[in-house]
Amino acid sequence: MEGINFSALAPRYGSRPMLSSWSDIGTSSMNGGAFNWGSLWSG
């Protein structure tokens, strides 16, 4: 999923696609994805 998100976000950020979109991906993954995975693992 990160690859898909990165591809979608990259053109939006122009000169710094990697840094900007990886920051967004990291934030959303930690807030959403990692939290959901934590719930699945603990459940």
UniProtKB/Swiss-Prot annotation:
Family designation: Belongs to the adenoviridae protein VI family.
Gene induction: Expressed in the late phase of the viral replicative cycle.
Keyword Ubl conjugation found: yes
Record keywords, A-Z: Capsid protein, Cytoplasmic inwards viral transport, Disulfide bond, Host cytoplasm, Host nucleus, Host-virus interaction, Late protein, Microtubular inwards viral transport, Ubl conjugation, Viral capsid assembly, Viral penetration into host cytoplasm, Viral penetration via lysis of host organellar membrane, Viral release from host cell, Virion, Virus entry into host cell
Chain positions of site Cleavage: 33-34
Pfam families (UniProt xref): MCPVI
GO biological process: lysis of host organelle involved in viral entry into host cell; microtubule-dependent intracellular transport of viral material towards nucleus
Comment text on domains: N-terminal amphipathic alpha-helix domain is essential for the membrane lytic activity. Late-budding domains (L domains) are short sequence motifs essential for viral particle release. They can occur individually or in close proximity within structural proteins. They interacts with sorting cellular proteins of the multivesicular body (MVB) pathway. Most of these proteins are class E vacuolar protein sorting factors belonging to ESCRT-I, ESCRT-II or ESCRT-III complexes. Minor capsid protein 6 contains one L domain: a PPXY motif which binds to the WW domains of HECT (homologous to E6-AP C-terminus) E3 ubiquitin ligases, like NEDD4.
Record-given protein name: Pre-protein VI
CC terms in the record's Gene Ontology section: host cell; host cell cytoplasm; host cell nucleus; viral capsid
Post-translational modification: Ubiquitinated by Nedd4 following partial capsid disassembly; which might play a role in intracellular virus movement during entry.
Propeptide regions on this chain: 1-33
Other observations noted: All late proteins expressed from the major late promoter are produced by alternative splicing and alternative polyadenylation of the same gene giving rise to non-overlapping ORFs. A leader sequence is present in the N-terminus of all these mRNAs and is recognized by the viral shutoff protein to provide expression although conventional translation via ribosome scanning from the cap has been shut off in the host cell.
InterPro entries tied to this protein: McpVI (IPR004243)
Cystine connections: none
